[in-house]
Amino acid sequence: MKPRKIILMGLRRSGKSSIQKVVFYKMPPNETLFLESTSKLTQDHISSFIDFSVWDFPGQVDVFDAAFDFESIFTQVGALIFVIDAQDDYLDALARLHVTVARVVTINPNICIEVFIHKVDGLSDEFKIDTQRDIQQRTQDELADIGLENVPISFHLTSIFDHSIFEAFSRVIQKLIPQLPTLENLLNIFCSNSLVEKAYLFDVLSKIYVATDSSPVDVQSYEICSDFIDVILDIGSIYGRSSQLKPGHSPEILDETSSVIRLSNDLVLFLREMNQYLALICIVRADNFEKSGLIEYNVQCLQTAIQSIFSPRT
């Protein structure tokens, strides 16, 4: 699969660099307070199960300036993520967003435009909803005035201090995976035949879920599965083989890694590696997990199918 280009944009201090460091470099959120504001265009290649080229544009830089080759930059972009600080006056940010969207869609009409309404951790639930509604309505009205009412834009409430940023990035990444419908169908079949309540395919580096079955995503189940990955990687770093992790490169799950945790609510978490970067995490009722042999057989079938999907065609 060829690398996907993702562009992060937004005004200064909107939180773009913090998002990138937390999601792809496992930086603790509290440490992002000491990050300096981005002063120049940075490009990071994130090497994992799915390769990404993430471009972080400084907030003070005008990408439409003659110094930038605007067309060549945006022609091959899979997704544009525009970050808005929800705790600040966002009218200037919206003005920049509207201009950016109007220019970008003329160059790349298939680009995925995602708006992260960021830093919502300090806001009440009611204020979050009101802020999202206001930003969404202003954007739709402004674009409609210039004849772009049909441009699809997705809005996400995000914070680096909880799992919402990973959930939002998961939604973005899934739009860039052409095999997503096939993966979802495989997971649906697996869950049905294995009596599994919920199944996720996680990218280990970023804790982004590449795909899940068609049942509704419950925030609590996603959070506990995401935390499960941290536990496995932490234990692996202590008792597994020693390796120095390069920035932007995924920690590898050891071959044939599997783990089971029984929860107090009569549920079982089951993890199984699909390859060195991708892990399957399932939520199973304890009674159904007694048929672990059946589940293991179906996992092997699923693993074979996934590997065949992404294997190079000759």
UniProtKB/Swiss-Prot annotation:
SUPFAM superfamilies attached to this UniProt entry: P-loop containing nucleoside triphosphate hydrolases (SSF52540)
Sorted UniProt keywords: Cytoplasm, GTP-binding, Hydrolase, Membrane, Nucleotide-binding, Nucleus, Vacuole
EC number annotated for this UniProt entry: 3.6.5.-
The UniProt record lists the keyword Nucleus: yes
An individual GO BP term: cellular response to starvation
Catalytic activity of the protein: GTP + H2O = GDP + phosphate + H(+)
InterPro entries, A to Z: Gtr1_RagA, P-loop_NTPase, RagC/D
Cellular component aspect of the GO annotation: cytosol; fungal-type vacuole membrane; Gtr1-Gtr2 GTPase complex; nucleus
Compartments it resides in: Vacuole membrane; Cytoplasm; Nucleus
GO MF, any single term: GTP binding
Topology term for the membrane: Peripheral membrane protein
Binding of GTP, residues: S17, S18, S37, H118, D121
Origin: domain of life: Eukaryota
UniProt entry tagged with the keyword Nucleotidyltransferase: no
PANTHER family: GH16429P, RAS-RELATED GTP BINDING RAG/GTR YEAST
Family statement drawn from the similarity comment of this UniProt entry: Belongs to the GTR/RAG GTP-binding protein family.
Function: GTPase involved in activation of the TORC1 signaling pathway, which promotes growth and represses autophagy in nutrient-rich conditions. Also required for TORC1 inactivation during nitrogen starvation.
UniProt name for this protein: GTP-binding protein gtr2
